[in-house]
């Protein structure tokens, strides 16, 4: 299994973000400051994890809500 790089996106002022899974392309709404790991509803891959503040994501931020 390859290492997945998680990055903290910039300019997230909203409370929710739409994130696109890099494995299956599914787009789902995620809280911008999660307290637990977020997995994709379709393939089960980890798409976001908590960092003590803003989320760290392995997918693409599609939209800030």
Curated annotation (Swiss-Prot):
User: What is the name listed in the Swiss-Prot or TrEMBL entry for this protein?
Assistant: Small ribosomal subunit protein eS27
On subunit structure and binding partners, the annotation says: Part of the 30S ribosomal subunit.
Source species: Thermoplasma acidophilum (strain ATCC 25905 / DSM 1728 / JCM 9062 / NBRC 15155 / AMRC-C165)
Instruction: Recite the UniProt cofactor note for this protein.
Output: Binds 1 zinc ion per subunit.
Which of UniProt's keywords are assigned here? Answer: Metal-binding, Ribonucleoprotein, Ribosomal protein, Zinc, Zinc-finger
> Can you supply one Gene Ontology CC term for this chain's record?
ribosome
Leader sequence residues: none
Family named by the database record: Belongs to the eukaryotic ribosomal protein eS27 family.
UniProt cross-references to InterPro entries, sorted A to Z: Ribosomal_eS27 (IPR000592), Ribosomal_eS27_Zn-bd_dom_sf (IPR023407), Ribosomal_zn-bd (IPR011332)
Q: Where are the zinc fingers (C4-type)?
A: 21-43
- Example GO biological process: translation
> Where, in this chain's numbering, is Zn(2+) bound?
21, 24, 40, 43
Q: Which domain of life is it from?
A: Archaea
Q: Name one Pfam family in it.
A: Ribosomal_S27e
Q: Name one GO molecular function term.
A: structural constituent of ribosome
- What cofactor does this one take? Zn(2+)
């Amino acid at each position: 299994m390859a290492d997945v790089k998680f990055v903290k996106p910039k300019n997230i002022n909203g409370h929710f973000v739409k994130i696109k899974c890099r494995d299956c392309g599914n787009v789902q709404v995620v809280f911008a400051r999660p307290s637990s790991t977020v997995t994709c509803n379709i393939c089960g891959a980890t798409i976001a994890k908590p960092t003590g503040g803003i989320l760290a994501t392995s997918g693409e931020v599609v939209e800030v809500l």
